[in-house]
């Protein structure tokens, strides 16, 4: 291995990767570049072009949108993340004095916990440590250099492709296994691009578990896209292992948000994506991360399909095939060719004792029949309840997508108004109204998740009243904004829009404050699903 003392990565000017270390004691000494203030309570990213992008440190809003507390964070670029990573490696190397790429592998093995690495490093068993980390102790004499005794002009076969090349065309790791550079390049490219491996790429020799160091990878790969992918992969664990760092969940965004303490608070990336730092989902006030996670799982898995089957079908009492009733008669005949059982849909008993009771079962009140019917009714009620909340959740989600498209329409309306002797400041009420509308849609969407898991009590009734009031006002505001605004109706509609979005803001604040008050005073009781 040709080990360089430096740890240099050159990032593509047009693309970035990201990574960050633990709670870095010396992070204040790093030049993190300029940061911007971000209002974390604003709505989604689609307003680019009307609203500016966010980034840098932020003031976190209170539950109603007001800035009740500081929740500061930084949005870090690839270079800034790499600075943190290199600084962490440098701090460790000041003590253990190994090549930087070896130290990076050691830190990765210990999930970037410097204290754990130091403790193991000085416990007196270095050979065991390096063996566990799958690297050769750099203090040992290199077997690779001992083997380089052939003349560079003498050809030798590669043990992968079996083609002959000069000795100078071969390279390897400290384990002593050498292969031609072409095979190395193709091997590394396959591992990085197709298998998504970065920090755990081992020597291609059969049975050898020695890891490929970063300098070797960067030296043997010539494709800049593969290098960039590798940079993303090796730094990923750096972010994932640090509770103060979180990747932006937006597709193709490689920024990282760094906070001073982890919490379920809204943060906004420079790309415009606002998300919950705790769970990484879109900001979901007023529902807590725990319940949102359960809701998403419930929506994604087949549990509701099972509920529908339980509510609308029954099993044949003989062969247990699932049967759906498609007529009014209770006389059921199993269509399974190997069964053909005849039974009563109501009590699931054999049909023969029923005589002429084609539409009514006189054994309806028997314990077994009652238990089966009660179970079916419970399943049906659970399904109907789920569909009630799910439909409203999805409706607001769909409306929110439509509302985001309003930004483009509003921008056009604002430009038209300015051409009719209105100033820029006079038309800003439209943008503000769409901002409020999107905030209300998002809040309403997540109130239905909150309500789904909420047990009924006096406080839940107040919550539902607040929810209904906000929902009605939001629909009225949406209707105002979708109207065609003529010059004659401008002043009238302007007053209505301003009054309504201010009312929506107020009602949204009341709803959120009530929910958060319930959290603080432990007023809410939940249905465990």
Swiss-Prot record:
Residues 154-365 are annotated as: TRIAD supradomain. Residues 380-529 are annotated as: Ariadne domain. Zn(2+) 5 binds at residues 316, 319, 334, 339. Zn(2+) 2 binds at residues 175, 177, 203, 208. Its main location: cytoplasm. A zinc finger (IBR-type) spans 228-289. It is an enzyme of class 2 (transferase). One of its GO terms (biological process) is protein ubiquitination. The active site is at 329. One of its GO terms (cellular component) is Lewy body. E3 ubiquitin-protein ligase, which catalyzes ubiquitination of target proteins together with ubiquitin-conjugating enzyme E2 ube2l3. Acts as an atypical E3 ubiquitin-protein ligase by working together with cullin-RING ubiquitin ligase (CRL) complexes and initiating ubiquitination of CRL substrates: associates with CRL complexes and specifically mediates addition of the first ubiquitin on CRLs targets. The initial ubiquitin is then elongated. E3 ubiquitin-protein ligase activity is activated upon binding to neddylated cullin-RING ubiquitin ligase complexes. Interacts (via the first RING-type zinc finger) with ube2l3. Associates with cullin-RING ubiquitin ligase (CRL) complexes containing neddylated cullin. Belongs to the RBR family. Ariadne subfamily. This is E3 ubiquitin-protein ligase arih1. It comes from Xenopus tropicalis.
């Amino acid at each position: 291995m040709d080990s360089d003392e430096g740890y240099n990565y050159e990032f593509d000017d047009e693309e970035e990767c990201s990574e960050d270390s633990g709670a870095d004691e010396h992070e204040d000494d790093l030049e993190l570049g300029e940061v911007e203030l971000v209002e974390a309570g604003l709505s989604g990213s689609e307003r680019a072009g009307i609203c500016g992008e966010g980034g840098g440190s932020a003031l976190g809003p209170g539950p109603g949108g007001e800035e009740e507390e500081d929740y500061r964070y930084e949005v870090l670029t690839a270079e800034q993340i790499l600075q943190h990573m290199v600084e962490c490696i440098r701090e460790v190397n000041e003590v253990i004095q190994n090549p930087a790429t070896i130290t990076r592998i050691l830190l990765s093995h210990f999930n970037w916990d410097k204290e754990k690495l130091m403790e193991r490093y000085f416990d007196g068993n270095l050979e065991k440590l390096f063996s566990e980390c799958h690297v050769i102790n750099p203090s040992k004499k290199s077997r690779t250099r001992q083997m380089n005794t052939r003349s560079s002009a003498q050809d030798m076969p590669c043990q992968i492709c079996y083609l002959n090349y000069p000795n100078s065309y071969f390279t390897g790791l400290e384990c002593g296994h050498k292969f031609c550079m072409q095979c190395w390049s193709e091997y590394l490219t396959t591992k990085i691009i197709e298998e998504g491996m970065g920090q755990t790429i081992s020597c291609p020799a059969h049975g050898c578990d020695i890891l490929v160091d970063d300098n070797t990878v960067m030296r043997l790969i010539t494709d800049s896209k593969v290098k960039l992918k590798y940079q993303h992969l090796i730094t990923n664990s750096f972010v994932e292992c640090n509770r103060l760092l979180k990747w932006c969940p937006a597709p193709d965004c490689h920024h990282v948000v760094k906070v001073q303490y982890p919490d379920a608070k809204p943060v906004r990336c420079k790309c415009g994506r606002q998300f919950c730092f705790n769970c990484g989902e879109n900001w979901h006030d007023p529902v807590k991360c725990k319940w949102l996670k359960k809701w998403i799982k419930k929506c994604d898995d087949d549990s509701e399909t099972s509920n529908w089957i339980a509510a609308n079908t029954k099993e044949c009492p003989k062969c247990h095939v699932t049967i759906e009733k498609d007529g009014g008669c209770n006389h059921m005949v199993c269509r399974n060719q190997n069964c053909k059982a005849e039974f009563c849909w109501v009590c699931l008993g054999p049909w023969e004792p029923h005589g002429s009771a084609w539409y009514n079962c006189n054994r309806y009140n028997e314990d077994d029949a009652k238990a089966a019917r009660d179970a079916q009714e419970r399943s049906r009620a659970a399904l109907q309840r789920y569909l009630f909340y799910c439909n409203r959740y999805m409706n607001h989600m769909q409306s929110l997508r439509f509302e985001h498209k309003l930004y483009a329409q509003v921008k056009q309306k604002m430009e038209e108004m300015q051409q009719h002797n209105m100033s820029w400041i006079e038309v800003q009420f439209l943008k503000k109204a769409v901002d409020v509308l999107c905030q209300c849609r998002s809040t309403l969407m997540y109130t239905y998740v909150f309500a789904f898991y909420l047990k009924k009590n006096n406080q839940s009734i107040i919550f539902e009243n607040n929810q209904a009031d906000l929902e009605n006002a939001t629909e009225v505001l949406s209707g105002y904004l979708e109207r065609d605004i003529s010059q004659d109706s401008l002043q009238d509609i302007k007053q209505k829009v301003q009054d309504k979005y201010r009312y929506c803001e107020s009602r949204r604040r009341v709803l959120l404050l009530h929910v958060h008050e319930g959290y603080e005073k432990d007023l809410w009781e939940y249905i465990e699903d």
